[in-house]
């Protein structure tokens, strides 16, 4: 029985995701599928539009057999940390044969070549990088030019400018770094770019779908999302549990910043950026506006988003030194095939499986990472318009199909 692993966010699940899932199954000829999925906060540095259990329902209805949560410390981090945490978790299951991911490039050999150079940093690459850095350009631009020089490929700039290619390269780096035996596959992304905000083409991006939902609701999305996604979103919105956006947390974040809660313990914060964020918090009470005030050529919006989310969730950079990847397997949902795989994982994986949250202290010698997931849910539910009770992880049932 071939087992396929994929890394997802499904924020929300749309037809492009369905295409990737079905094509991955055909390409790898795997009979079973495991998804490692971001929880209530995602890699863009913002809350998911609906909670992790609603998105697990979408995944299972689409044909995923087992959904495992990616710890929030990795789910909300840089592309490099996100990829490493997710790949390490997939590999730690010890049953995954194939791993399929989307990319704009769609060429595994080309992406692997780039990943190997970035991971191994051969002397000729380091020399070129050093030369370009001396000229005063940014590290990202220097890296791009150095790669272009050593690989002799004029498309490097184009490859490194798109989010799925960047993640694909990080996935391949992580597989190589941990010496994984999982076989990678990439599928060329179809339709709009991940960051596109326009609803158009055969497959619309998740960003454009979210924008449409916040501005106009669910009407007009039938062409871009499966019926089950629409039904799950509709039910969630009727219960006032979404759509959730970063703006819901504006007051909390502005309060923390005006109170000068230290930022220097957060990953990727420099002194100049810290002061700029503090100053901006006195000029607005809206987090989206704050990011526009801080954003510059040097400080990208993505970097600022990640800092704000880590401030909101109290995630400090020390946690990345304490752990080398996730130290548990948190199950969110499964079907009958998923149940079979869980039995195999229990036999083969060195990590404890958590299906009953109340038992986490007995199962984990270090509970810090898991408790961040619990806290993230408690923060997330503050955005609900009706009830914002804490401790939802302890009482929400597993999603079973």
UniProtKB/Swiss-Prot annotation:
Chain segments annotated as transmembrane: none
Gene name? tmcAL
Gene Ontology CC terms, in alphabetical order: cytoplasm
Q: Molecular function (GO) terms listed?
A: ATP binding; ligase activity, forming carbon-nitrogen bonds; tRNA binding
EC number(s) from the headed UniProt entry: 6.3.4.-
Catalytic activity entry:
cytidine(34) in elongator tRNA(Met) + acetate + ATP = N(4)-acetylcytidine(34) in elongator tRNA(Met) + AMP + diphosphate
Write down the superkingdom of origin.
Bacteria
* Pfam families given in the database record: HIGH_NTase1
Q: Can you supply a Gene Ontology BP term from the record?
A: tRNA modification
Where can this protein be found? Answer: Cytoplasm
Does the keyword section mention Protein transport? no
Is the keyword RNA-binding in the record?
A: yes
Q: What does this protein do?
A: Catalyzes the formation of N(4)-acetylcytidine (ac(4)C) at the wobble position of elongator tRNA(Met), using acetate and ATP as substrates. First activates an acetate ion to form acetyladenylate (Ac-AMP) and then transfers the acetyl group to tRNA to form ac(4)C34.
Q: Cite the InterPro entries for this sequence.
A: Rossmann-like_a/b/a_fold, tRNA(Met)_cyd_acetate_ligase
What name goes with this protein?
tRNA(Met) cytidine acetate ligase
Q: Per the UniProt entry, what species is this protein from, by scientific name?
A: Thermoanaerobacter pseudethanolicus (strain ATCC 33223 / 39E) (Clostridium thermohydrosulfuricum)
Gene3D superfamilies the UniProt entry points to: HUPs (3.40.50.620)
Q: What is its main location?
A: cytoplasm
Q: Which family does it belong to?
A: Belongs to the TmcAL family.
Indicate the enzyme's highest-level EC class.
Answer: ligase
């Amino acid at each position: 029985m071939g087992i396929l692993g994929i890394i997802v966010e499904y924020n929300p699940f749309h037809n492009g995701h369905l295409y990737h899932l079905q094509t991955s199954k055909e390409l790898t000829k795997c009979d079973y599928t495991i998804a490692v999925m971001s929880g209530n906060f995602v890699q863009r540095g913002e809350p998911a539009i609906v909670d992790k259990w609603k998105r697990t329902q979408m995944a299972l209805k689409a044909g995923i057999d087992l959904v495992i949560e990616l710890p929030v410390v990795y789910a909300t981090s840089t592309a490099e940390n996100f990829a490493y945490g997710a790949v390490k978790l997939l590999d730690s299951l010890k049953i995954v044969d194939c791993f399929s991911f989307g990319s704009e490039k769609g060429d595994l050999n080309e992406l692997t070549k780039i990943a190997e150079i970035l991971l191994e940093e051969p002397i000729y690459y380091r020399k070129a990088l050093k030369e370009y850095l001396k000229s005063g350009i940014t590290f990202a631009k220097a890296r791009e030019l150095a790669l272009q020089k050593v690989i002799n490929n004029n498309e490097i700039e184009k490859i490194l400018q798109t989010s799925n290619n960047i993640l694909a390269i990080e996935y391949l780096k992580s597989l190589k770094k941990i010496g994984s035996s999982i076989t990678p596959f990439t599928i060329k992304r179809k339709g709009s770019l991940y960051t596109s905000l326009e609803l158009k083409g055969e497959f619309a991006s998740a960003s454009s779908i979210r924008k449409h939902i916040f501005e106009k609701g669910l009407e007009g999305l039938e062409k871009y999302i499966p019926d089950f996604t629409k039904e799950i979103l509709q039910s969630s919105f009727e219960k006032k549990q979404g759509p959730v956006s970063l703006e819901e947390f504006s007051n909390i974040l502005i309060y923390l910043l005006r109170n000068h809660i230290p930022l220097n313990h957060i990953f990727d914060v420099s002194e100049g950026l810290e002061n700029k964020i503090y100053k901006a918090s006195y000029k607005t009470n809206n987090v989206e506006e704050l990011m526009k005030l801080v954003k510059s050529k040097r400080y990208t919006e993505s970097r600022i988003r990640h800092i704000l989310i880590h401030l909101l969730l109290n995630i400090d950079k020390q946690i990345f030194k304490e752990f080398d990847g996730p130290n548990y397997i948190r199950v969110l949902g499964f079907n009958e095939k998923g149940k079979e795989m869980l039995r195999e994982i229990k036999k083969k994986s060195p990590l404890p499986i958590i299906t009953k949250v109340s038992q986490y202290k007995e199962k984990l010698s270090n509970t810090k990472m898991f408790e961040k997931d619990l806290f993230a849910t408690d923060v997330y539910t503050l955005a609900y318009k009706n009830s914002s009770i804490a401790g939802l992880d302890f009482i929400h049932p597993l999603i079973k199909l």
